[in-house]
Swiss-Prot record:
Substrates-to-products reaction catalysed: GTP + H2O = GDP + phosphate + H(+)
Location of this chain's protein in the cell: Nucleus; Cytoplasm
Keyword annotations of the record: Acetylation, Cytoplasm, GTP-binding, Hydrolase, Hydroxylation, Magnesium, Metal-binding, Nucleotide-binding, Nucleus, Phosphoprotein, Ubl conjugation
Name of the gene this protein is made from: Drg1
The record's note on its domains: Its C-terminal domain interacts with TAL1. The ThrRS, GTPase, SpoT (TGS) domain is not necessary for GTP binding nor for the GTPase activity. It appears to play a regulatory role favoring GTP hydrolysis mediated by DFRP1/ZC3H15.
Alphabetized Pfam families for the sequence: MMR_HSR1, MMR_HSR1_Xtn, TGS
First-tier enzyme category under EC: hydrolase
Record carries keyword Magnesium: yes
Domain OBG-type G residue range list: 65-290
Binding of Mg(2+), residues: 78, 98
Residues reported in the UniProt entry to bind GTP: 71-78, 96-100, 117-120, 248-251, 271-273
Family affiliation: Belongs to the TRAFAC class OBG-HflX-like GTPase superfamily. OBG GTPase family.
Protein's UniProt name: Developmentally-regulated GTP-binding protein 1
Residues recorded as bearing (3S)-3-hydroxylysine in the entry: 22
Organism of derivation: Mus musculus
Length: 367
């Protein structure tokens, strides 16, 4: 591993020395591709020894969503977690064998949300220092990441944590690059750009792909893409996770400073100690998770509004709903009756491909 780390340090130093302009874009693109390949070696080392990157530090996924809390020691992360779990927890004592710092599962708006403390994100975690690599491997499985920062020194910590997560293939609050990429057997590199490109040209694209030993491929750039965007698509192992920056200890700043923080995107100011602004934080968590609640209505009975079936926003068809209840239900499915925003008439008869919306009511009719 030390050889890989030395190569990474070498490339990073060369990138820092290189001025960024049109003339150096090609060279920088090449360096970035080499860096990404070396980082991948760290994430998934060659050879079988020592288990996977998350070995000994994983926990069964329970509930409808998983939130990872990341932050430096002494920023108030533990206080926030225990107070959140204490106030909103459905189960106060939640048992995990390998991860003792998990306070539990909270229930909010009918959904069960698992809270995970991810300790040890320190500078150099992505380079294999401490337990940082195992922690970030678990972070990759989260539906939402909360970066907890001390309001008195937020920017330095924010940058370090973001760099660690980025280096492990986690992209915060961003969408996958709009790039079409398809390898083929022959025909060379065929590059199509549907809009003007400020950074990538044919030569840079070819050299980045050559670094991956790819000499035949169709590449379509549908937005103004960077070398990093292309590398992310070629690597194919990136995860795109929403993130909220929780600025703690607001009892130590002025009202004027608080007003400024409120205008920063993706930020929620709180005081974990005094439990200030927890409602705002939970509402933002709910918005970012984009969960969809579906209520069930047994035939001849009133809908059950106490325990919704909770679906991720990307999988909300009637078939997805059936699979969440029981995989055999779809085999017996005839049609469904739906009440709510997803239909024009209440109730409306729909098939398994119908897309449901939050707080719809559904009744399944079997064959």
């Amino acid at each position: 591993m030390s050889g890989t780390l030395a190569k990474i340090a070498e490339i990073e130093a060369e990138m820092a020395r290189t001025q960024k302009n049109k003339a150096t874009a090609h060279h920088l693109g090449l360096l970035k591709a080499r860096l990404a390949k070396l980082r991948r070696e760290l994430i998934t080392p060659k050879g079988g020894g020592g288990g996977g990157p998350g070995e000994g530090f994983d926990v069964a996924k329970t509930g409808d969503a998983r939130i990872g809390f990341v932050g430096f020691p002494s920023v108030g992360k533990s206080t926030l977690l225990s107070n959140l779990a204490g106030v909103y927890s459905e189960v106060a004592a939640y048992e995990f064998t390998t991860l003792t710092t998990v306070p539990g599962v909270i229930r909010y708006k009918g959904a069960k949300i698992q809270l995970l403390d991810l300790p040890g994100i320190i500078e150099g975690a992505k380079d294999g220092k401490g337990r940082g690599r195992q922690v970030i491997a678990v972070a990759r499985t989260c539906n939402l990441i909360l970066i907890v920062l001390d309001v008195l020194k937020p920017l330095g910590h924010k940058k370090i944590i973001e760099n660690e997560l980025e280096g492990f293939g986690i992209r915060l609050n961003s969408k996958p690059p709009n790039i079409g990429f398809k390898k083929k057997d022959k025909g060379g590199i065929n590059l199509t750009a549907t809009c003007p490109q400020s950074e990538l040209d044919a030569e840079t694209v070819k050299s980045i792909l050559a670094e991956y030993k790819i000499h035949n491929a169709d590449v379509t750039l549908r937005s103004d893409a960077t070398a990093d965007d292309l590398i992310d698509v070629v690597e194919g192992n990136r995860v795109y996770i929403p993130c909220i920056y929780v600025l703690n200890k607001i009892d130590q700043i002025s009202i004027e400073e608080l007003d400024i923080i409120y205008k920063v995107p993706h930020c929620v100011p709180i005081s974990a100690h005094h439990r200030w602004n927890f409602d705002d934080l939970l509402e933002k968590i709910w918005d970012y998770l984009k969960l969809v609640r579906i209520y069930t209505k047994p035939k001849g009975q009133l809908p059950d509004y106490t325990s919704p079936v909770v679906l991720p926003y990307s999988r909300t068809t009637v078939e997805d709903f059936c699979m969440k209840i029981h995989k055999n239900l779809i085999k017996e499915f005839k049609y469904a009756l739906v009440w709510g925003l997803s239909v024009k008439h209440n109730p409306q008869k729909v098939g398994k491909d119908h897309t449901l919306e939050d707080e719809d009511v559904i009744q399944i009719v079997k064959k």
